[in-house]
Swiss-Prot record:
Part of the 30S ribosomal subunit. Contacts protein S5. The interaction surface between S4 and S5 is involved in control of translational fidelity. One of the primary rRNA binding proteins, it binds directly to 16S rRNA where it nucleates assembly of the body of the 30S subunit. With S5 and S12 plays an important role in translational accuracy. Gene3D superfamilies: RNA-binding S4 domain (3.10.290.10). The lineage of its organism: Archaea, Thermoproteota, Thermoprotei, Desulfurococcales, Pyrodictiaceae. It comes from the Archaea. It comes from Hyperthermus butylicus (strain DSM 5456 / JCM 9403 / PLM1-5). This is Small ribosomal subunit protein uS4. Pfam families: Ribosomal_S4 (PF00163), S4 (PF01479).
Amino acid sequence: MGDPKKPRKKWMGPKHPWIKERLVRELELVGRYGLRNKRELWKLETLARYFRHRARSLLALPPEVREKEEKALLARLNELGVLPENATLDDVLNLTAEHFLERRLQTIVYKKGLARTIYEARQLIVHGHIAIAGRKIRSPGYLVKKDEEDLVDYAPTSPYAKRRLEEQVQQEEAAS
């Protein structure tokens, strides 16, 4: 049978460790998006780099060959919600890690108002208070697809969901 394959790391760190502009930019992104460490940022930079590389390789192909793969690449990025439907390969070449940081579950929970801070959003997710379509997701780095975005809410078993339901009932009683 053989041994299972060794899991490879899914990120590539910076080529030079002490470039001040990069360090300042990374620190600002870590703070703004509530990341635990820079490795979380580097994973998304690697993902953006992968899609940019695919776009460059597609641009090198003849037009009749690249058409099918170009549609698949753009459809994937549209499904993730990173690019709009009418995007082109030039838009893919402009992708950055920030495009993917905006699609993280942690960021979406904060922007939907389910948490007061980005750090509270991370804690709610890790503690199992957030679900997508009723399914608990405990990974703050989960990339939320465009069609899942409306389904992000408190988990049905969470005390936060029960508290919000009680508040809604009280508001309805007060209104009537």
